[in-house]
Regions:
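Short, surface-exposed "cap/lid" segments of acyl-processing enzymes
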Residues: 85-155, 164-166
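Catalytic-loop region of hydrolases
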Residues: 11-104
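Primarily recognizes the serine-hydrolase "nucleophile elbow" in alpha/beta-hydrolase
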Residues: 187-260
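C-terminal catalytic histidine-bearing segment of alpha/beta-hydrolase fold enzymes
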Residues: 323, 328-331, 363-449
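Alpha/beta-hydrolase active-site loop
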Residues: 143-148, 155, 172-195, 214
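Fungal secretory targeting signals
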Residues: 1-20, 449
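Accessory cap/linker subdomain of secreted extracellular hydrolases
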Residues: 30, 238-339
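Short beta-strand/loop motif that positions the catalytic acidic residue
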Residues: 342, 347-354
Length: 449
C-alpha cells in the first residue's frame, strides 16, 4: 500500500505541478495539531457527552489536492468533539465538514481517509491543508489522493465529513479509538446544524478504501454496541486488509511497506502502556531514535525512511517473542468489540490481484458476514491489471453509485449478493471532475501495465 500510494501520488504531484498557479505564493505556515490549541483536549472533557461539540472554526489554510481546490467545495469547518479512547476514557477528536455548492443537507458521507501514521499531526484535518504540504515531514500525498475521492461525493451535492479517527495521540491500529471517533463524529455531525446547516436526521453513509476501509469496518462492527441510535444507510469499503493477527504485521518486514510496522506498533502503544514498555525495553539503543521517527512524520516520509528496512532487526532477538506477546495482548483488547450483527448494509469491493490482501481471506470474510445474516453486496474485480491502488481509483465509482441508492432511500436487497467486476478503466465521468493534468495522470496510471 505504502509504496504504491507514494508512487501514484508522486506521479500526480508531478503531473499537476503547473496547477500551482492557483496559489503562487507559499501559503502561510500554520502550526501542526500538536502545537495548535484548537486540537487540545480540554481539562473539563469529562463534562461533555460523546459526540458533543466543544468548538469549531473554519480551516486556517486552503484545502488542496495537488495544488487544486476541489471544484465543488464551497466551504469547510473543523469541529472538535468529545469521544472515547481505547481505555474508555473521555478524549476529543477533530472532524472536517466539507460543504459543496448547492448542498443537499439531508445527505452526508463520512469518508474515512487512510492515515497509517502515529501522530496527531498526520490527521486529515491538517494534511488536507495547503500549508501542511509545505512541510516535508508532514505533507501527505495520500490525503491529497483521497481528496479526489471526496470530490466524487461533493459533485453529487452531498456533504462529506472526514474524521481524524486516530485521535489526539495518533493511535493508528487502535480499533476502539478508531470506531469511537468515527461514530462520535457522526453524532457531532447530527448536532452541527448551527454550524454546518446539516439537518438533524440526514441520510448517512460511510466510505473508505485501504486504511480507510479498515477504519470503516471497525465503525460498522462497533455501531450496534457503541452508538445503536445512529441510522447508517450503508457503508462501502474496499481494499480491505487480510491480516488476521497483530503479529502478521511483521510479514511485511524488509519489504516496501515496512514503514507500517513502527507506525502500527507506536500507534497501538499510545493506548497500551505495557506494549509501549515492551517496545522501549526491546529496542537496540542505536535504533531508538530511528524507530521513533514516525511520531514526528507522516506515512509518506516514513515509507521512504523504512523502505525495505529490517525493522525486526532493530530489536534484541531475545526480546522479540515477548514483544509479539504484548502486541497480541493489546490487539486482543482492541478487538473485544465483535458485534452480534452489523446493522448497516455493506458494499465490499476488492481486487483479486490486490498484493496487500489474500483474496481467499477476503472471500472468507464476506462469506462469514453472509453466514451471520448481514446484508452484503460483494464486488469482486477480476481484471489482472487492477492492483491495490488502481482499483481504489477504478472502484470508487461503483461504491458511490451504490451509496447513492442507499441515500435515496432504496432498499439494499436482503441477504448477500456477489458480482464480478470486469471494469479495468477509470470512469470518464469521474475523470472529468478534475483538471486535465490530474485526470491525464490518473488515466496513465490506471492504464499502465
Amino acid at each position: 500500500m505504502v509504496h504504491l500510494y507514494y508512487w501514484l501520488a508522486a506521479s500526480l504531484a508531478v503531473s499537476a505541478s503547473n496547477l500551482r498557479f492557483i496559489d503562487r505564493n507559499h501559503p502561510q505556515l500554520i502550526p501542526p495539531p500538536s502545537n495548535d490549541p484548537f486540537y487540545a483536549v480540554p481539562g473539563n472533557i469529562d463534562t461533555f457527552s460523546p459526540g458533543d461539540i466543544i468548538k469549531h472554526r473554519e480551516p486556517p489554510s486552503r484545502i488542496s489536492a495537488y495544488g487544486w481546490t476541489p471544484t465543488h467545495l464551497q466551504k469547510a469547518y473543523q469541529i472538535l468533539y468529545r469521544t472515547t479512547d481505547s481505555q474508555e476514557s473521555p478524549t476529543a477528536a477533530v472532524l472536517t465538514a466539507l460543504i459543496p455548492r448547492d448542498a443537499d443537507y439531508n445527505k452526508v458521507i463520512s469518508l474515512q481517509m487512510a492515515e497509517d501514521s502515529a501522530t496527531i499531526d498526520c490527521g486529515p484535518s491538517y494534511t488536507m491543508l495547503a500549508s501542511a504540504q509545505e512541510n516535508p515531514l508532514l505533507m501527505s500525498n495520500i490525503t491529497q489522493l483521497q481528496l479526489l475521492f471526496a470530490e466524487v461525493v461533493l459533485a453529487r451535492k452531498w456533504i462529506v465529513i472526514v474524521p481524524d479517527y486516530e485521535g489526539p495521540k495518533g493511535s493508528f491500529a487502535a480499533n476502539k479509538m478508531t470506531g469511537h471517533a468515527i461514530l462520535d463524529g457522526i453524532r457531532a455531525t447530527l448536532r452541527s446544524n448551527h454550524i454546518t446547516g446539516i439537518e438533524p436526521n440526514p441520510k448517512m453513509g460511510l466510505l473508505g478504501y485501504s486504511g480507510g476501509a479498515a477504519a470503516t469496518q471497525v465503525a460498522v462492527t462497533m455501531h450496534e454496541g457503541y452508538a445503536p441510535e445512529l441510522e447508517i444507510a450503508g457503508a462501502a469499503m474496499g481494499g480491505l486488509s487480510s491480516l488476521g493477527n497483530a503479529s502478521d504485521i511483521f510479514s511485511i518486514n524488509k519489504g516496501p511497506s515496512a514503514g507500517l510496522i513502527p507506525s502500527a506498533l507506536l500507534g497501538l502503544a499510545s493506548q497500551h502502556p505495557e506494549l509501549q514498555k515492551s517496545i522501549d525495553e526491546s529496542l537496540k539503543p542505536e535504533f531508538r531514535e530511528y524507530f521513533y521517527s514516525p511520531l514526528h512524520q507522516c506515512l509518506q516520509a516514513s515509507s521512504v525512511m523504512f523502505y525495505y528496512q529490517d525493522v525486526l532487526g532493530m530489536f534484541h532477538n531475545e526480546s522479540i517473542p515477548g514483544l509479539k506477546a504484548e502486541l497480541e495482548k493489546a490487539w486482543d483488547k482492541e478487538t473485544q468489540h465483535k458485534a452480534a450483527r452489523i446493522k448497516a448494509p455493506l458494499y465490499v469491493y476488492q481486487s483479486v490481484v490486490d498484493h496487500l490482501s489474500s483474496i481467499e481471506a477476503i472471500d472468507a470474510l464476506v462469506h462469514g458476514y453472509c453466514d451471520r445474516g448481514f446484508n452484503v453486496h460483494y464486488e469482486r474485480a477480476n481484471s489482472p491489471n487492477l492492483g491495490h491502488v488502481k482499483y481504489g481509483l477504478v472502484g470508487v465509482s461503483g461504491a458511490v453509485s451504490w451509496l447513492q441508492d442507499r441515500l435515496d432511500g432504496k432498499a439494499a436487497g436482503v441477504g448477500c449478493s456477489n458480482h464480478t467486476d470486469t471494469t479495468s478503466t477509470l470512469d470518464p465521468d469521474i475523470a472529468a471532475l478534475y483538471p486535465r493534468n490530474i485526470s491525464d495522470a490518473l488515466y496513465a496510471i490506471v492504464n499502465a501495465p
